[in-house]
Amino acid sequence: MSPQSALLLADIFDRWRLQLPDPIVNWLTPVWILCVGAAAGLLLTAVLWGVLRLLSAIPGIGTLADEPTTSRVAIVVLSIVFLGLSIGIYQGTRRAQAAAPAAGAAAQPAPQPANPQDRIWGWGGAAVGCFLLAVALVTLVSRRALAETRIAIREGVLWPLFVVGTVLACGSLFGLVLIRKPTELLESLVRGPALWMAGTTSVPIDLPAPPDQFADPAQQEIRVNFRKDEIRSLIVKSDQHVRVRTEPFDSQTDPSLVVTLDVPAGEEKTWLRDQAGANPFREAIVTKLYAKNLSTAKAHVDVTPILKVAYPEMSLVPILAVAMAGVFFIYLLLRAAFPKLSAVALATAKSDIAQPIYLILFVIGLFAIVLFVVIPYNTFGDDIKQLKDSGLSLILVLAVIQSVWAASTSVADEVEGKTALTVLSKPVSRRAFILGKFTGIAWSVGLMVAILGVWLLIWVAYKPIYDFREGGYEINHQQQNTDPTWHDCHREMVQIVPGLVLVYLEALVIAALSVAISTRLPTLANFIISFAIYVLGHLTPLLVQSQVVANQLPPIIFFGRLIATVLPVLDHFNIQASVAAGVNVPTVYLLWSLVYCALYSTVAMLLALTLFEDRDLA
């Protein structure tokens, strides 16, 4: 879409936009971005499913998963191809990053070389990921797996997730007449890949020497082409003394609104855009800058504009889209690769969702999150941090209660009620029974965390508006007399997304341990032990690191370290410090938390299989 078309559509939508108060629009804009992500997720899922459907129609590919030897060869070949593509993309990205600091070393430091150990871990993880992707592709391209898509959506947790996603996608359509200039926001989705592929380019120009050293240097135009809302910095490098301006030198514009770079010979100057200040460029598409050669020799000038998308907040859309598509295809993959395990998981998830306690926990979560918004915390401007912490803690507690209750009812009660004996009398192994129970609990808990998480995101986006009206919200830690912008609401909203991921990972660890306990103990004992593990998992690090306890009660330190070695340290999934400091959680931390969760869940499942293997079910 051309810039002129985008601006025209933006004006059309702006004319039809409902005239809502600015605070409401600022709240609804990040919510609309969330809805666009859901719509993109449904669209991406449909497109990928269509591609798999077309591939399955090719003779020999649709039946590839049914031929073990051929499928193994295909997996190896696809793994090599995916790894090669990953290496190519990585090398291209590294070259692009290396070129950017070369053009503007003053703007940003050069990237440090990667640690060899981190590089080994990174490429090892990439190889494993490529292998798993190849296995998934060979399995999902099966005609049998794709034929069961409709049944898979209508049963289990995919249907409520589909309903929620559809409601959010409809919200993206209604948002077109509620927010300001939505086409400009949507255009950032297209401009992001375009800017990444274009990279950072310099505009060279030679400025002739003045005919007379006493004469006023002539003004020269520098031809550029970028959008004013995408410029982040401007780097000018010259071998002679030059001066570059964003307006003609004879312009009567207020000097505070004009960028002037005086570049000495052999140096470079960098202008950094102040996001809170006025944009010095007046035209939507900047096509020219102005320069003068202040030396007595010919000057060679390199002008490098550093561009980024106008609305980086839209990066949430592809992340949500990939996450939604990933959940859908992981569900189909488990159903196709492990049919017996998936049958047990489906029955477990449907049974858990149908329980009255599941609905009760849902209602408690929905009402409590809204209540947290209006509760005065009296924190002198940090009420929103308390809302985030309270909301995440609430979702975690509800998820833990649901996981322990589900493990007790689906394993312990079925064993005591002889229902498990009936299931195992069919061609279902004990291993598939236990793993299926855990998978079903993981799906039901994931549904709860997802829906309550979206509800929390919506109200966290509203909290800055509410607190500002109550006089308790500070923008950028400085009191201002303007309402929080939608950028502020979006920033507060996305900061808790990693927290929701960690909440789910912690609930999975508790669920795995609860399943292992429920293979031998009844419901009450399972609740007591599981919540004791929950408390110790959060309390043990404090005891181990306490200097007062270390000096006065050394035995407690010993037992604390012993418990920390045997039991999972659940404090790794707690981001309360990050929320209090207002900083984002690094992606690497989430990946290591995922590895930690996978390791402890695997150990718990091995323990559950060992305890259940010789359990007398008669």
Which residues fall in each region the model found?
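Short, strongly hydrophobic alpha-helical membrane anchors
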Residues: 1-29
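Secretory targeting signals
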Residues: 21-41, 48-55, 68-83, 94-131, ...
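Helix-loop-helix units of permease transmembrane domains in multi-pass membrane transporters
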Residues: 25, 53, 57-72, 154, ...
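Alpha-helical transmembrane segments of multi-pass membrane transporters/translocases
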Residues: 26-50, 118-143, 160-179, 312-329, ...
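Cytosolic-side transmembrane helix boundary signature
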Residues: 55-63, 130-163, 335-337, 418, ...
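Transmembrane helix segments
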Residues: 85-91, 164-185, 363-364, 368-378, ...
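Beta-strand-enriched, solvent-exposed domains that form extended recognition/catalytic surfaces
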Residues: 174-316
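Aromatic- and glycine-rich beta-strand/loop motifs that create alpha-glucan
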Residues: 338-359
